[in-house]
Amino acid sequence: AANIDRQAFDPNDGFALISSEEELRLSWEIAGREAFIDFQFIPRQGNTPAAPLIKSLGIDSSTIMEGLDPNYLFWVGDRDLELRDGWEIFFDRVPTRPYSVEKGYLVPGEVTVSTREGRATVEIDGLNSENFSGSLAFIFYRDSPFIHMEARVSTERPATAFLYHVGLAKPETQGQNLEWIDAFDNPRIEPISNSTASVYQTRYRSIALSNTNGSLVVSPFPHQYLYPLDFADNFGYNWAGHEYLDMIDGFAFGVRQPP
């Protein structure tokens, strides 16, 4: 069972919280309706895998999505920090040197729920990969449907360059569709199939999973997402499908920083 710390939670900030040893529900108002998200902290037991972190989310009494599990992949390479005439390389060619890909695993430990001036944060300690460690945080905003999910991790590995791929895995896909707007501004919708994951060249770097109750869109924060670029080519910033990079089990969809 996870230890849930709610000392910094104030219901006067516009959020309601219900928690137990294994679950947590956060709810808030959006345009006169009540949005909710249910987290569950059920670890792996023997051959039984851990339960998806996000049990369900929706509005009022209608569940839009259920059984979602965040996944983070880190591409880890090496910076060239050798000084040349007193300067470090600015345009470092990291991809020309060996790099590896590692998966982050979340084993929920301390869960901290806090509020401040119209926003709430659920931070779950225990996100670790081979070289990174830290927590997974969800930030919610009063009267807004946006949920900001971020890995708050750091590394002691010296001279590290990294990229990340992040997504949501969903084991049960019956009745679900994949939606996006393609590079030519055409809306696209396809039922979820058993095809291997592939990269999508979308507009707005956004891709959605939808059903008859609603949709869930994955999109990066534009000014926190990419390293500085001198051009604006569409390298395919979204991905979806089964067994992504042979590192995420089943179906998942998300965003990526292209190597």
Residue positions per predicted region:
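Acidic-aromatic substrate-binding/catalytic surfaces of carbohydrate-active enzymes
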Residues: 5, 10-107
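A short, sequence-level motif marking secondary-structure junctions
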Residues: 40-45, 141, 194-197, 222-225
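Boundary at the C-terminal end of the N-terminal hydrophobic targeting segment
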Residues: 1-2
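Ordered hydrophobic segments in well-structured contexts
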Residues: 25-27, 38, 121-123, 137, ...
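Acidic, contiguous internal or C-terminal segments within carbohydrate-active enzymes
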Residues: 110-177
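Beta-strand-rich recognition/accessory modules
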Residues: 206-259
